[in-house]
Each structure stands twice: as C-alpha cells, then as structure tokens.
Regions:
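C-terminal binding/interaction regions
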Residues: 2-6, 10-11, 89-146
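Short, structured active-site "lid" loops
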Residues: 45-63
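Mid-chain, well-packed structural core segment of small domains
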Residues: 63-64, 69-109
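Short active-site oxyanion
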Residues: 2-3, 58-61, 80-82
C-alpha cells in the first residue's frame, strides 16, 4: 500500500514523524510537500496528495495542517476523495469502517505524536465494512455529479 502525504508549515514537523512511522510499519509513501516550516498554503499540498489518491497513484492519503480542517476541505474538493478529519483512533477506525475514507486529515496543533502514530496505524489497517455503509458511500459519491 502506498500512502500520499501532504502538509503545510503547521503540519511539517508531525508529517516528518508520520513518515518515520510509515517506514517503521513497512508502508511506501510519496511526499507531496511542504518541505519546511516556511509559511505556505495548505490547499496546494492537500490537493496534490488528494490527486495522487484519486488518480490511483497512491492507495490512501494522510494530510496535516495545524487544525486538520483546512487541508481536509481542500482534499475533499478533488473528485473521488473522502478525506475525514480525525482527532483520535476511534474516528480513524470508524471513518474507514463506515465511510471508506481514502484520506485522513490530522491537526498537528491538537494531536501528539503518540496519538498520531496510533491513528495512522488504525487508519491503514482498518477495512471498510461494506453492506449498508456501501450504499451510503455510493450516495455520497453520487453527490459529486450534481
């Protein structure tokens, strides 16, 4: 499984930690930036990571900014993306089980390294349940055609 990563300056340090976490867990990743703590714009990097997932170049994505909110909104503007802002492991698990989220957004200003590490592992190992949830996901995805 290959993971797309993106962040802004507020998420840079946590993204560096997430890259090490992915390496330790044996996942391949592609880093779509940013590449320093210099001020930058989260839509650029959230969208780049989301495009890689939407185009099938990466299987899932993790994006990070200070709150996780802005970068998740940017990622969700890309057709085919279901990016969930997650603050804990239960949210990371349930968004995979019930929403088949293909991206997760993390708020670096509110999420410590230990929590982020556990969230990444849960997000990447939890399977979609399908069933009634598949019907709901299909309805969400149909909204993109409106």
């Amino acid at each position: 499984m290959k993971i797309a990563l993106g962040c802004d300056h507020g998420g840079y340090e946590l993204k560096q930690f997430v890259m090490k976490t992915l390496e330790n867990l044996g996942y391949e990743y592609e880093n779509f930036g940013c590449y320093s703590t210099e001020s930058c714009d989260y839509p650029d990097f959230g969208a780049a990571a989301a495009r890689a997932v939407a185009e099938g170049k990466c299987d899932r994505g993790i994006v990070i900014c200070t709150t996780g909110i802005g970068i998740s909104i940017a990622a969700n503007k890309i057709k085919g993306i279901r990016c969930a802002h997650c603050a804990d492991c239960l949210e990371a698990e349930m968004t995979r089980r019930h929403n088949d989220a293909n991206m997760m957004a993390i708020g670096a200003g509110f999420t410590g390294k230990n929590m982020a590490e556990r969230m990444v592992e849960v997000f990447l190992t939890t399977e979609f349940e399908g069933g009634r949830h598949e019907r709901r996901v299909n309805k969400m995805m149909a909204l993109e055609q409106e």
